[in-house]
Amino acid sequence: MEFSEWYSDILEKAGIYDLRYPIKGCGVYLPYGFKIRRYSFEILRKLLDETGHDETLFPMLIPENLLAKEGEHIKGFEDEVFWVTHGGKTPLEVKLALRPTSETTMYYMMKQWIKVHTDLPLKLYQVVNTFRYETKHTRPLIRLREIMSFKEAHTAHATKKECDAQIEEALTLYKAFFDEIGVPYVISKRPEWDKFPGADYTMAFDTIYPDGKTMQIGTVHNLGQNFAKTFELEFETPDGEKDFVYQTCYGISDRAIASLISVHGDEKGLVIPVDVAPIQIVLIPLLFKGKEEIVMDKIKELNNTLKSEFRVHLDDRDIRPGRKYNDWELKGVPLRIELGPRDIENGHALIVRRDTGEKITVEYSNILEEVEKIVSMYKENLKLKAEEKVKSFITVLDFENDVNSLSEKVKAKLLENKGIILIPFNESIYNEEFEELIDASVLGLTTYEGKEYISVARTY
Amino acid sequence: MEFSEWYSDILEKAGIYDLRYPIKGCGVYLPYGFKIRRYSFEILRKLLDETGHDETLFPMLIPENLLAKEGEHIKGFEDEVFWVTHGGKTPLEVKLALRPTSETTMYYMMKQWIKVHTDLPLKLYQVVNTFRYETKHTRPLIRLREIMSFKEAHTAHATKKECDAQIEEALTLYKAFFDEIGVPYVISKRPEWDKFPGADYTMAFDTIYPDGKTMQIGTVHNLGQNFAKTFELEFETPDGEKDFVYQTCYGISDRAIASLISVHGDEKGLVIPVDVAPIQIVLIPLLFKGKEEIVMDKIKELNNTLKSEFRVHLDDRDIRPGRKYNDWELKGVPLRIELGPRDIENGHALIVRRDTGEKITVEYSNILEEVEKIVSMYKENLKLKAEEKVKSFITVLDFENDVNSLSEKVKAKLLENKGIILIPFNESIYNEEFEELIDASVLGLTTYEGKEYISVARTY
């Protein structure tokens, strides 16, 4: 099955996201999908809270004159902004944009809060919906008109040094986040022509989808003093001088969810990383005539034992076990535990791993410990598999002075192996003309195994 | 100080909400305010999750034809809907409403999901931003153009009986929620002319603000089959017949936060209920020359002891203790613990309650237990005080056949005691004409101490 078909199919069948809403690029997070989102963003929140970021909530509407304040920024967004022009039947005096992102909103407010160096650093974030009038093909959780979950962090600092250090902190946080949700990544410094509108430079996380195309899943922008000058974010330094703050911003969206689904899934359905799984363990009783009560009693006991540490679901529906297996494999539940009369007689239980399909018979008396062990193997394996997949998608080419010959080789490799092609850095090909020649995107400058490359790929 | 002045003042000074945004009725949840919101809505989420409600996320934009599908419903909202008319520079073919509430969105989708009685009950909720083009005076967290937090639950049932039972469940949940965040309430069945547009009837929670005006803080609507017929929510019953589902919906907004602030605050600032306090205990070291290290070591130890159960903050700023006391009293931190050299010598610590101002010397060796005891007294006291306040605002009048004389008495009482006036039910005054006569609102039918009354009040 083609990846994109598999993807649409699994979103519907596993109850992740329903796109049958009468506006293109707008859909519904279904209960199961919402739980994955909730657990994922809780991990992100925890990482941010622990490093001194404060959660806030800013307005969704932006007056036109405020959005237009930063020239480059508005140029980057003006074709894709939704505009509110009426309240009831009354035309508004100033039209209002649905936030495409919140720099202008947040920096307008920061102006009220930042007066002196002791007000800094300021490290804020919010998790909100944002909007883009996409005219291109939309794709659920990947290219939406309503991005339902956008975690955007915005920081302000007294010195360039602290600002640069914040970029490092953001990269570290995002690495930790993607590691925890099991999504592998390649980090690149985006080329000038593809950086965030208004930024000094942009660092980006890309992952690779099963079809070999890359997906941008996180960005970290060093804004320098650009926005600060526009928004007059001036403060008094310890020496009593005036200076503009240095700023960073960084964001992660629903694409994190799309990616953890896409990277791990297989032909049977989802394979969910343990930490974000709505159900971590499903219990299936194997009922035989006359033994129903013994089995149900035992499996309820097991449910209680495991509940203290895991999100467990006891599937006691009156359908045959085989159908239950299929249902929960489709939904990507990490572990399934089967318990029948013979298991109980022998003091055993059967654990089945979703990632490898492996069946493991364990001592019932020791089950919590056994489950913990298998859960940590599952985590380790998912991480390894994801990293291997990404590695298998990376090809290193030699640089050649003959641009035409080089670009032919790149194109051939992109057709053959897909994924990311790395070429040792050379200024002569680091430009948009090269993108046109290879009919693919320059992701930017990527450090890989200690060396610096230009990375190129077909992107989503 | 006037209540409304106190309220605006405290939002700013305590860092709850900043309204200096260039759109009327739109503002920013600041870090401290956001935490109160987060803890409050977590309580609500937990209550909903435990009773089988599933969290979801639906689109924010509603096509005009979908919003207009239910005639009464759209009539109730059409004057206050914000309309998106353009994407970039392109006029949209169908204009899009910013959701004022999500009945139409959700029921359009329910049509895709409900086919047969086994698909029921369906109990969904979401916590989202909603929008009203308010032309009246706006007020932070009370009357907003962007309602930043709206928890809306929507359920569908196979029978009227189950639907009615769901109304009871919703009332029970909301009671538990307001009890936990310490906001007292009076429940009324709203009169016909004030029910939710499209509902069979509306039950509402009102609390009373310090100025004697009531604030609607939660509503529970029995929609019967009204929306189901419009949205064709038909299903196959166990007998193979066709029927329309029975529906309820119920919502709680930022007003819950506004109310817990307003009901408990005093002239020194906020008094926050323990369960939603961003900081539950603040530790203040009393430093004397030469004893700094002893005190700091001990108070760090105390911090570690208490952290296991409470949200604790150690205030080690280099300012005098008096200023710290003021800061944390303003922010409404439930308990303050002071520790100085003499306390350490005597094996004591001093605990100060924010609600009563009481100072309690406790044995340091037993401090966790002592704190737990005081915390539970604090909770109990806040609940009692809030209930007493509401009771003191309730006046019962006798019914009189002479409507003019009765309305004069109501008006006098409203001037004198403010709050809610209860009048034994009589059909002759249960109408909008009576509202005009008394220049106040009929809240509806209220059961109070076992009897049924018509309740009237000045409302926000």
From Swiss-Prot, chains A, B:
GO biological process: prolyl-tRNA aminoacylation
This protein's GO CC annotations: aminoacyl-tRNA synthetase multienzyme complex; cytoplasm
Gene3D superfamilies listed in its UniProt record: Anticodon-binding domain, Bira Bifunctional Protein, Domain 2, C-terminal domain of ProRS
Reactions it catalyzes: tRNA(Pro) + L-proline + ATP = L-prolyl-tRNA(Pro) + AMP + diphosphate
Subcellular location as annotated: Cytoplasm
Sorted UniProt keywords: Aminoacyl-tRNA synthetase, ATP-binding, Cytoplasm, Ligase, Nucleotide-binding, Protein biosynthesis
Domain of life assignment: Archaea
Record-level Gene Ontology MF annotations: ATP binding; proline-tRNA ligase activity
Keyword Membrane belongs to the record: no
EC numbers on record: 6.1.1.15
Pfam families documented for this protein: HGTP_anticodon, ProRS-C_2, tRNA-synt_2b
Top-level EC class: ligase
Free-text note on domains in this protein's UniProt record: Consists of three domains: the N-terminal catalytic domain, the anticodon-binding domain and the C-terminal extension.
Membership in a protein family: Belongs to the class-II aminoacyl-tRNA synthetase family. ProS type 3 subfamily.
Function, in words: Catalyzes the attachment of proline to tRNA(Pro) in a two-step reaction: proline is first activated by ATP to form Pro-AMP and then transferred to the acceptor end of tRNA(Pro).
The protein, known as: Proline--tRNA ligase
Organism the protein comes from: Methanococcus maripaludis (strain DSM 14266 / JCM 13030 / NBRC 101832 / S2 / LL)
Taxonomic lineage: Archaea, Methanobacteriati, Methanobacteriota, Methanomada group, Methanococci
Gene assigned in the entry: proS
